[in-house]
């Protein structure tokens, strides 16, 4: 019975319990809705959260689309102040700066003018108070004293007896002051001039080597610049003197005097040329003048002109050839030629194509004379 009753009771209880649970759930829902408990709110929030998540995803996508559009705007805002800095200042700022500079210049000129006017006003007019205080006069005081001094000078011009002594002292003082100011200005100018300081060359180990190398280079350059003098043989000097057509002694005398006078005022290179010319002339003397033949100087007799001229033409035509005449000046040689041979118009009109043999061949006419002027091998020497 117990089991049956229990079962029946259980069945009854189950039904009742089902009904009771349904009623309880409804009550709980009502109370939950009335009280607003957390469970119901959570469910609502979850629903709202799901909706919000979708909306936030949509918003994120929309923001991603808008970000590349917004970034250049921010960059342009950042670049804007830099561009404004590089721009030129506005016109008002430029005008203000120029006006300030103009005002400074004007005030500087005014101050300079008042300072000059203070120096022009003598101390006697300023009075003892200003001299004792040693203070700088104000601009108004300076103007008043200057006006007073100007009126005194005008009155003295009109009336010479008007405070002549006082004005004389003022003028003397101003003159002394001007002299003092000039001296001070000169001293200031000397002080302002920069004095060049001579820097001592720094002594290094390789300085001596460098200086020696530089001196060697300079000496080599100077040696290259000095012209080399070609050696002149005795034959060339004989030919040069023989073409002139003067006796050896007179040519030697004239050339030696010209070479001495020329060497005193010429360069070392020309002195060497004159020495070479003298050596050639001495060789010519040895050829033309023989110690055993004392009659060779008979060419200096008055009949020497007939020796040079035969049948109205000169036996020794002027020929120079292409040999250089070192150490000889044209004026001296030409003078000696004109004195010895008056029939020639110009002793330097030599033919350029004439050979030395043509000049020497004219000496064959001198064979009839008693003295031996030329040696037998003399023409061969010129031909070699």
UniProtKB/Swiss-Prot annotation:
S-S bonds: none
Region feature Disordered, mapped onto this chain: 1-101, 187-227
GO term, biological process aspect, one: cell adhesion mediated by integrin
Lineage: superkingdom: Eukaryota
Domain bHLH: 94-153
Any Gene Ontology CC annotation: nucleus
UniProt keyword terms in alphabetical order: Developmental protein, DNA-binding, Nucleus, Transcription, Transcription regulation
Biased segments, Low complexity type: 209-224
Reported tissue expression: Expressed almost exclusively in the attachments sites of the somatic muscles to tendon cells in the epidermis.
SMART domains with a match to the protein in the record: HLH
CDD domains: bHLH_TS_taxi_Dei
InterPro entries reported in the protein's UniProt record: bHLH_dom, bHLH_transcription_factors, HLH_DNA-bd_sf
Pfam families: HLH
Gene Ontology MF term list: bHLH transcription factor binding; DNA binding; DNA-binding transcription factor activity, RNA polymerase II-specific; protein dimerization activity
Record localization: Nucleus
Basic residues bias: start-end ranges: 75-86
Function (record text): Probably plays an important role in the differentiation of epidermal cells into the tendon cells that form the attachment sites for all muscles.
Complex and partners: Efficient DNA binding requires dimerization with another bHLH protein, possibly with da.
The protein's name: Helix-loop-helix protein delilah
Gene that produces this protein: tx
